[in-house]
Amino acid sequence: KSSAASDVYKRQILCVPYTDLFYAWHTTEGTNIHIGAENMHWEEKGAYTGEVSGQMLKSIGVEYVIIGHSERREYFAETDETVNKKIKSALAHGLKPIVCVGETLEQREAGETEKVVTNQIAKAFEGIEASDLEKIIVAYEPIWAIGTGKTATSEDANNSCLLYTSDA
């Protein structure tokens, strides 16, 4: 791998709440730390009280945005379709999406990890240009390991990464 390619894997990204974005950007200016938002809305304009668009994020120096986090999916009823809209909007505004995928404990115990993660990736990336795939980071988020005392192994993460690589 070239040094440029390997640098991507060493990038430090700090994703903070909206209220801390400008402060984080200002504080880390001139460092190797990149700033990301924890969420965004896919529409650029409209009556979406409390939502922040990709254009707004970009205007204050944000480079990355988390999309599809399990908490957003669970508590705010985000779907694979809304994740797809957010990815497209992020890319259109020059942001680099960090797309979360992962399975619940029930899905894991039923042996459905591959099916669930593959489906999430396929729906999230529907209509995304191949040239844009390199701008997207996929984060394996094993939902079953959050607050359960169970931990994902490096093999779990590697297997999910292989699913992404083969789908892409």
Q: Across the structure, where does each feature detected by a protein language model lie?
A:
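Single conserved hydrophobic/aromatic residue that forms the stacking wall/gate
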Residues: 1-5, 9, 164-168
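Fold-independent oxyanion-binding glycine-rich loops
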Residues: 16-18, 37-40, 69-70, 101, ...
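Short, charged, surface-exposed secondary-structure boundary motifs
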Residues: 43-49
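Expand to "…catalyze enediolate/carbanion chemistry for C-C bond making/breaking, isomerization
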Residues: 53, 58-62, 70-166
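Glycine-enriched alpha-helix->loop->beta-strand junction motifs that scaffold or abut catalytic
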Residues: 28-35, 61-64, 96
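Short linear Ser/Thr-Pro motifs
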Residues: 2-3, 31, 53, 70
